[in-house]
Amino acid sequence: MNQTIQLVIPMTGVGQRFVNRGYSDIKPLIQTGIGSMLAGVLRNFQSITSPICIVSDSHPQKSRLKDEIIRLRPQARIVEIEAHKKGPSFAVWCAKEYLDLELPTIVNYCDFSGIWSEDKLIKNLTEQDGLILTYQGFHPHRFRSNAYAYVKKDINDIVTEVQEKSSFTNDPSKEEASSGTYGFKTARIMLSAIQTQLDQNISHNEEFYTSLTYIPMIRDGLEVKTMLIDKFFQWGTPDDLEDFIFWSELAAKKTNPKCPSDTTNGLILAAGSGTRLAQSTDTPKPLIKVFGKLLWEYSAELINSCLNKSIFIRSRDQAEYVSTNCPNILKLSINSSTNSQAESAKKGLEMMKPNDLPVHVLAADNIIQQVKISDVTEKLKASDLIVWVTKNYAIAKLYPNHFSWVDVDSMNQITKVYFKEGSPNKESFSILGNFTFKSMQIAEKVIGEVISQSLSSTETYLDHVIEYCLKKNLKVSAFIVNKSFSIGTEEEWSTSTYWQESFSALGQFE
């Protein structure tokens, strides 16, 4: 048993955002893709065998939570306190009688994990009065929110200010944000600061955050420093967690579910140059690798059950790869770039063997999980065109003018399209770039007419087909994808790189 460091994990919160999303488990028990949230916390503290876990005495899942604690750390000390909504520092205060006042102490929130050196943390813990584990630079969860704790330091790297739920500047990536791991030279120092925090009501929205416990310490002249961690995994909201699970499944090489043979055509558009990624890579976009697979192969998995499968390409390297590794996909190659996405689709369709079957036209830069192409085909019974869309794509919400959007009614019929202009409707869906047409004839006709009518003053996208079909009173419906990712912008490239580096470092799937 390690008696040199105290680890305290408050777990008394309700996790209301998860409850609202329909999660039935209490937050520490929610699965993340690499185990429960609590397991993700404890993996960072391998040397601490007897953490102090604070739980609510009245939570209906208390028994299950206690079982999970003991499963992970048989020698853990479980402290039950009355339910409250006063934040983690208040929970620690309620458990103060269980703390050794002279031991170095770590308070760790229960809804995140990361990668850092435990040995370095333990060494640094006793070299100053307080130690905040922080992260800096690009982090994907910042696309959704900036509501985290941030620190400000002087020229000697001493923390001078701590602020909850907001950065100090307009560029949070250049600041150090708190991960949720808080160290104190002794529990005595910590509890003294918490007492002042409670007495002076140093809180945010009536919650006593442990980040704010350092404010009395700083005022009293105690030394607080930070330790930057290598990677940070945020699970504090359902969207953050679901992003992490999405990437964990890619890392684990999970594929889309198998589906029965689909009597349709599948066409992947992979002739683009990917110029928007020029600052990050000179690799043609379809040849970018994500967890060991070429980007377009994720789309190839989707159309694997289609009767006829084709890919429209322009690169000799791509053609050789397709022939060698995907012999069942017909390659349709050209020697130069097309002028637009719509023109690529038109040329690709013209090069395919004519038939009366439906056709799925897929972008080569989408990664879509847990979708059966047969489910999309089924919707063609009541539609002439199906547009693949999603609702919770963080980068689209952050840069709405970079995406096209549609309004969808209660019957999943598309009623309006907003082309690269954002949407005034918060309930709108962003377009993924995949389209399913009732027949090849319909696809060739509407795409050809959109190009000839030049409805766009710039590049003609397949997105423009939606407006054309609506004006012609064709039935246009939405196929809603719950989780997807695209690599078409610098932000998306950075996100993909971050997660690949993270899971490689985790070593969970190697």
Segments from the language model and where they lie:
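Conserved core of the sugar-phosphate nucleotidyltransferase
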Residues: 114-201, 369-453
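Short alpha-helical oligomerization interface
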Residues: 23-28, 282-286
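Conserved N-terminal catalytic core of the sugar/cofactor nucleotidyltransferase
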Residues: 1-10, 17-19, 31, 35-107, ...
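Active-site glycine-centered loops adjacent to acidic/histidine catalytic or metal-binding residues
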Residues: 13, 111, 136, 237, ...
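A structural signal for short hydrophobic beta-strand segments in well-ordered beta-sheet cores
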Residues: 29, 151-153, 226, 287, ...
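Alpha-helical elements of Rossmann-like donor-binding domains used by nucleotide-donor carbohydrate transfer enzymes
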Residues: 93-94, 120, 213, 243, ...
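Conserved alpha/beta core of the MobA/IspD/sugar-nucleotide pyrophosphorylase nucleotidyltransferase superfamily
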Residues: 2-7, 101, 175-266, 428-510
